[in-house]
Every structure is written in structure tokens, then in C-alpha cells.
UniProtKB/Swiss-Prot annotation:
Database matches in PROSITE patterns: FIBRILLARIN (PS00566)
Organism from which the protein derives: Thermococcus kodakarensis (strain ATCC BAA-918 / JCM 12380 / KOD1) (Pyrococcus kodakaraensis (strain KOD1))
Highest taxon listed in the record's lineage: Archaea
NCBIfam families listed in its UniProt record: PRK04266.1-2, PRK04266.1-3
Keywords assigned: Methyltransferase, RNA-binding, rRNA processing, Transferase, tRNA processing
Assembly, per entry: Interacts with nop5. Component of box C/D small ribonucleoprotein (sRNP) particles that contain rpl7ae, FlpA and nop5, plus a guide RNA.
One Pfam entry name: Fibrillarin
Name this protein carries in UniProt: Fibrillarin-like rRNA/tRNA 2'-O-methyltransferase
Protein's GO biological process: box C/D sno(s)RNA 3'-end processing; rRNA methylation; tRNA processing
Gene assigned in the entry: flpA
Record EC number: 2.1.1.-
InterPro entries noted in UniProt: Fibrillarin (IPR000692), Fibrillarin_CS (IPR020813), SAM-dependent_MTases_sf (IPR029063)
């Protein structure tokens, strides 16, 4: 087994003895597993395998994502942080110089994040409603990237509203869109076109990528604030 750097800073490729490749992040808190993921050691460093079936962002990278604005030192607002599966990999990437502000609506789900953030001090858990971005203004500064994984019909509007308050000029948004959460009666492609049109009223749409086969009827959009 060996590990090499991915073209995205902070992401790695683990090459198993059988030649198969997986993506991973260097564990910011060695010894800590977050969601039962496989952990490997190579040349004195510990890497956490990024499971694409458990993480939309992981699926996007494996599917050939071209634009990945989350980098070492980035400040990220994560909407729909849940119990921290993807956020833990984002935490690994941004490192101690970066910060992940994780907004979650459900108190029960956010409680699951508490043990994680006790050691990962670069994740700030926030109980809040992503549809009301003013509600966490006292806690969140201007950020480099907003990542949204909120399965709601208004998810494009949620990203726009949060970007108006928190995203730096020239900053990036990433949004995982589940077509069935927006309109179950329409074909996914039609929904994605409508979302892209709505996003383009405020952002420059940089990229759109299907998350099949890892996530059915999902697409990831990367957008840039002018």
C-alpha cells in the first residue's frame, strides 16, 4: 500500500496492494474514527478513507470534480452539518489554521457532533436554521466557502441568502441538490436546470456534476460569488 497526493491540496489517494485507489484525508486527530471509516498508516502519518457512499463531497471528488475551493487554511460555513461525516474530512483538509462553522437544525443530530468537536477544535457546531441566516450572525465571520447539504425545496435560495450575509466576494459555494427533495413530480434533469437558473441569478455557476452511482438523483453545483 502507498499514499500519494491528490491534485486537490489536503486530499490524498490511497493505493492498495491490489492496485485499487481510494481517496482519503490526513487525520487531524490521529486515533479518532468518525463514522467507522477505514484508517491506514503510511510513513508515520494516519489517513482516513473517504467513503463516497456516506459523503456527497467524497462522491463528487471521485466523480472527477474539477473545482474544489476548500483548501488548507480555508474558513467554511457548512449548512446541514448533521453528525459530521463529511465535515470531519473538511476539518482534516482546512487543518488547525482553518475553521468549519457547522449549522444544524436538529438538536438531537447536533448532539452527535459534540464528541467529535471536543478534539476537533476547528469545527464550531451551531444550532440554527439555514433558512434564517441572520440567526447565527454573532457566531460566523465572512467565509471563503459555503457548503450546503440541506434537502429542502428552497435549497438554492438558502445558499443565495447565506452567501449574501457570509460569503466573501470571489468566494465559492458548493451545493448538493437532491432533485426529489425539490419536486418529486419532475424529472431530475429538469429540476437541476431550474436550480442552475436560480443560482445564476446571484452566482457564476462554475460546475455541475452528477453524483451517480453513489447518490441517486443528486447533483453537486460549484458556484462563485462575483
Amino acid at each position: 500500500m502507498k499514499v500519494k497526493k491528490h491534485r486537490f491540496p489536503g486530499v490524498y489517494i490511497v493505493i492498495d496492494d491490489d492496485g485499487s485507489e481510494k481517496i482519503a484525508t490526513k487525520n487531524l486527530v490521529p486515533g479518532q474514527r468518525v463514522y467507522g471509516e477505514r484508517v491506514v498508516k503510511f510513513e508515520g502519518e494516519e489517513y482516513r478513507i473517504w467513503n463516497p457512499t456516506r459523503s456527497k463531497l467524497g462522491a463528487a471528488i471521485l466523480n472527477g470534480l474539477k473545482n474544489f475551493p476548500i483548501k488548507p487554511g480555508s474558513t467554511v460555513l457548512y449548512l446541514g452539518v448533521a453528525s459530521g461525516t463529511t465535515a470531519s474530512h473538511v476539518s482534516d483538509i482546512v487543518g488547525w489554521e482553518g475553521k468549519v462553522f457547522g449549522v444544524e437544525f436538529s438538536p438531537r443530530v447536533l448532539r452527535e457532533l459534540v464528541p467529535l468537536v471536543e478534539e476537533r477544535r476547528n469545527i464550531v457546531p451551531i444550532l440554527g436554521d439555514a433558512t434564517k441566516p441572520e440567526g447565527y450572525r454573532a457566531l460566523v465571520p465572512k467565509v471563503d466557502v459555503i457548503f450546503e447539504d440541506v434537502a429542502q425545496p428552497t435549497q438554492a435560495k438558502i445558499l443565495i441568502d447565506n452567501a449574501k450575509v457570509y460569503l466573501k466576494s470571489g468566494g465559492y459555494g458548493m451545493i448538493s441538490v437532491k432533485s426529489r427533495s425539490i419536486d418529486v413530480t419532475k424529472e431530475p434533469e429538469q429540476v437541476f436546470k431550474e436550480v442552475e437558473k436560480e443560482l445564476s441569478t446571484y452566482f457564476e455557476v462554475v460546475e455541475r456534476l452528477s453524483l451517480e452511482p453513489y447518490e441517486k438523483d443528486h447533483a453537486l453545483f460549484v458556484v462563485r460569488k462575483p
